[in-house]
């Protein structure tokens, strides 16, 4: 104990030692107090930070309203005390003042600021460029604070612009309400139309089902129609072959009629001569009775006339005339047969189209309109062949009453022959002439009458033969057309047959398509049901929307809500009132550590005052002084922070206790280093201080530090002092504080034990050195 008292006596009696120790008592206060006072609440005085605003905005028009966002911002800033606002129109001068550190921030509002705000509804809207200029090289913190001011300005401008947009939007809500009302009416019409469509869809579904069944029947009937068309084609081909034979017969008739025409012409000529001779004979007959007396003299004359009549009759070539009459009979029979064949042919042509129509009309599964369309389709496939006008041909042919009376002609010819025979006998009967005068006169009369009939018959024969020849010629022309038409009919019927087979294929496709249509119509009917439900709901919702939109009554409070809808609330678990409070754990720990290092400079840590009895007494004679200095340092700095600067803590007495524990732990570390190693130990203590400045986590979170600092973070004593101070000052987590205090006490005990060990070794060494001279 003598050593301890001697140590305090030396301090009190030595001003060179006492005054420095007293000064050391205030080192933590000077370090911590001065620093914390200077930066206790720098953000609370940013209203003194000079910032200049350069407004170059020219304004714009949006939806009929004048936009002056730049001017509005300037007016708002003039009523804002967050910064020391200055306003200018000269950008170049403001930038020069920034370089000269007159301002820490230059805010530039460009000339198109409001104009860009009016492009919000354009295809390519432009953002509002709020430019700012800082000079971080002159003062980084000032530039950083200025950037935070820009964030606030950005929020303010965004709010102002949004309010302008919101006003325009709400002004248009009435138009929107009207449009929604109109849309509701339109949706109602859509709903009504959808109902009609739903009903039509049901009918369509039903009819398509019928169509599906009918198309199968159509396919079967079309196959039958195709077979019938093939049979018609075969019949037409037979008809065409028969027409060829008819044409050959017609040519033969034409040749015979030409021969008959030649014979009838010759007959007419000879009959003229006969009639003239008979007329001469007839003229002489009245005088026959009167000239009986002159008969003898006239016999010669009568014989000559008889010879002349005989020549005329011989010249007639009655054989040819009979042949012509027989040919005429044959022609009449051929003409009758020919007329019958023409009539049959005409009927076959007329029945051609009817055959197709009968097949189609016989279908009981087609409607009248479908039958008409199918008949038109078939008729388009048939070539339009103009059949010859058979009625005209038949009218031009001579009828039976127009031909000469063949029986009469034959009878007259027989009479002529008989009379000629009598005339031939005239020379021989001259002697009997007188007795038969009456008979001769009657015979001549009959001969004349018969000759007239023959003449008239030959005239009719000639006229009839002429008409017959012309009719047959016309018939040949029309028959040629009929033959050509039959050939076209053959071609057309083949095309129709081919078309019907295509129609058969098409009907099968129609059958397949109608089946798909029937299936699709079912889906359509289901979809229309869903659509009907949706259109009804759409109409109702649009009406509700129109009513609700029309009821909107916006005011400034509404505009403000849209412009700034979010209100932030800082519900901190443990709040820190200012910047200085947040830095106190870090700065206070450094002050106490620096105070310990300064003490080792003015207070001798090794030289004993008197003779210590052992190493512990030697250690404690030094440590009790350092412990008292540490406690006083802690009390002074803690009291000034609490009462002088205004530090607020969660527990005052715990704050005092933890400050003392921290100071004693740091002193124990520094004592060991300085005692055992002298100045190199002090240097190591300074190195530890420097490492703790970066690695203890006093400013930025540990996760933001480089990896090396994160590794050594747990080995540094300030790490635990800072965490403990945060717990007692801000968090109120006293359990965590005592945990950190336990770590510091453990470090202090280890350092004290090492120091005691060193002093014990040193004390033994001193004792050994004293004993050696004595011996």
Curated annotation (Swiss-Prot):
Keywords on record: Cell membrane, Membrane, Transmembrane, Transmembrane helix
GO CC annotation terms, alphabetical: plasma membrane
Cited Pfam families: ABC2_membrane_3
Membrane association type: Multi-pass membrane protein
Signal peptide: none
GO MF assignments: ABC-type transporter activity
InterPro entries in UniProt: ABC2_TM, Phage_infect_YhgE_C, Phage_infect_YhgE_N, T7SS_ABC-Transporter, xxxLxxG_rpt
Segments passing through the bilayer: 16-36, 585-605, 625-645, 655-675, 742-762
Highest taxon of source: Bacteria
Compartments where found: Cell membrane
NCBIfam families xref list: pip_yhgE_Cterm (TIGR03062), pip_yhgE_Nterm (TIGR03061), xxxLxxG_by_4 (TIGR03057)
Family assignment from sequence similarity: To L.lactis phage infection protein (PIP).
Name of the protein this chain belongs to: Uncharacterized protein YhgE
Gene (name only): yhgE
């Amino acid at each position: 104990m003598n050593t301890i008292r001697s140590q305090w006596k030396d301090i009190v009696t030595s001003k060179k030692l006492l005054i420095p120790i007293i000064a050391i008592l205030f080192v933590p206060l000077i370090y911590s107090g001065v620093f914390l006072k200077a930066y206790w609440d720098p953000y609370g005085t940013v209203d003194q930070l000079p910032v200049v605003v350069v407004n170059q905005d020219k304004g714009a028009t949006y939806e009929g309203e004048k936009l002056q966002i730049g001017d509005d911002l300037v007016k708002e800033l003039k009523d804002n005390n967050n910064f020391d606002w200055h306003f200018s129109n000269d950008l170049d001068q403001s930038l020069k003042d920034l370089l000269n550190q007159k301002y820490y921030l230059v805010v530039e509002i460009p000339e198109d600021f409001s104009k860009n705000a009016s492009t919000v509804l354009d295809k390519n809207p432009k953002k509002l460029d709020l430019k700012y200029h800082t000079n971080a090289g002159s003062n980084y913190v000032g530039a950083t604070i200025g950037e935070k001011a820009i964030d606030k300005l950005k929020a303010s401008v965004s709010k102002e612009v949004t309010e302008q947009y919101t006003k325009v939007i709400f002004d248009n809500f009435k138009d929107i309400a009207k449009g929604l009302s109109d849309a509701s009416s339109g949706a109602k019409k859509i709903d009504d139309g959808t109902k009609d469509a739903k009903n039509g869809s049901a009918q369509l579904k039903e009819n398509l089902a019928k169509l599906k069944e009918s198309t199968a029947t159509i396919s079967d009937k079309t196959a039958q129609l195709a077979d019938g068309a093939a049979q018609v084609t075969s019949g037409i081909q037979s008809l065409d072959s028969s027409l060829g034979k008819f044409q050959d017969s017609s040519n033969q008739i034409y040749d015979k009629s030409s021969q008959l025409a030649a014979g009838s012409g010759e007959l007419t000529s000879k009959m003229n001569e006969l009639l003239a001779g008979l007329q001469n004979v007839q003229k002489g007959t009245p005088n026959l009775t009167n000239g009986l007396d002159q008969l003898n003299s006239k016999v010669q004359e009568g014989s000559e006339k008889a010879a002349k009549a005989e020549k005329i009759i011989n010249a007639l070539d009655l054989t040819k005339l009979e042949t012509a009459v027989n040919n005429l009979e044959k022609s009449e029979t051929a003409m009758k047969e020919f007329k019958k064949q023409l009539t049959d042919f005409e009927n076959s042509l007329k029945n051609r189209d009817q055959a197709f129509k009968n097949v189609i009309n016989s279908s009981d599964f087609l409607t009248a309109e479908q039958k008409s369309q199918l008949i038109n389709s078939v008729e388009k496939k048939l070539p339009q062949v103009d059949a010859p006008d058979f009625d005209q041909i038949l009218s031009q042919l001579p009828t039976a009453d127009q031909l000469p009376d063949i029986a009469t002609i034959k009878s007259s010819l027989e009479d002529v022959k008989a009379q000629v025979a009598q005339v031939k006998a005239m020379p021989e009967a001259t002697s009997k002439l007188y007795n038969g005068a009456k008979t001769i006169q009657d015979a001549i009369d009959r001969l004349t009458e018969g000759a007239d009939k023959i003449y008239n018959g030959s005239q009719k024969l000639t006229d009839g033969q002429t008409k017959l020849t012309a009719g047959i010629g016309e018939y040949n022309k029309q028959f040629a057309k009929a033959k050509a038409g039959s050939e076209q009919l053959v071609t057309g019927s083949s095309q129709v047959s081919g078309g019907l087979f295509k129609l058969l294929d098409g009907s099968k496709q129609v059958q397949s398509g109608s089946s798909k249509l029937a299936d699709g119509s079912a889906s359509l009917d289901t979809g229309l049901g869903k659509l009907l439900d949706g259109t009804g709901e759409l109409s109702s919702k649009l009406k509700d929307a129109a009513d609700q939109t029309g009821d909107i009554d916006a005011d400034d409070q509404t505009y403000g809500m849209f412009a700034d809808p979010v209100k932030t609330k800082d519900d901190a678990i443990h709040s820190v009132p200012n910047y200085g409070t947040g830095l106190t754990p870090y700065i206070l720990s450094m002050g106490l550590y620096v105070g310990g290092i300064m003490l080792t400079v003015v207070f001798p840590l090794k030289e004993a005052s008197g003779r210590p009895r052992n190493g512990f007494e030697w250690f404690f004679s030094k440590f009790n002084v350092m412990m008292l200095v540490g406690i006083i340092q802690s009390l002074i700095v803690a009291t000034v922070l609490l009462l002088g600067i205004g530090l607020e803590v969660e527990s005052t007495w715990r704050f005092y206790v933890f400050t003392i524990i921290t100071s004693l732990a740091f002193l124990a570390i520094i004592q060991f280093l300085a005692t055992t190693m002298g100045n190199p130990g002090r240097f190591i203590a300074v190195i530890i201080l420097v490492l703790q400045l970066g690695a203890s986590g006093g400013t930025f979170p540990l996760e933001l530090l480089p990896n090396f600092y994160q590794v050594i973070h747990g080995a540094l004593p300030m790490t635990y002092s800072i965490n403990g101070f945060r717990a007692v000052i801000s968090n109120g987590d006293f359990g965590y504080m005592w945990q950190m205090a336990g770590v510091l006490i453990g470090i202090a005990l280890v350092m004290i034990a090492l120091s005691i060990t060193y002093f014990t070794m040193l004390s033994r060494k001193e004792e050994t050195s004293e004993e050696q001279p004595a011996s």
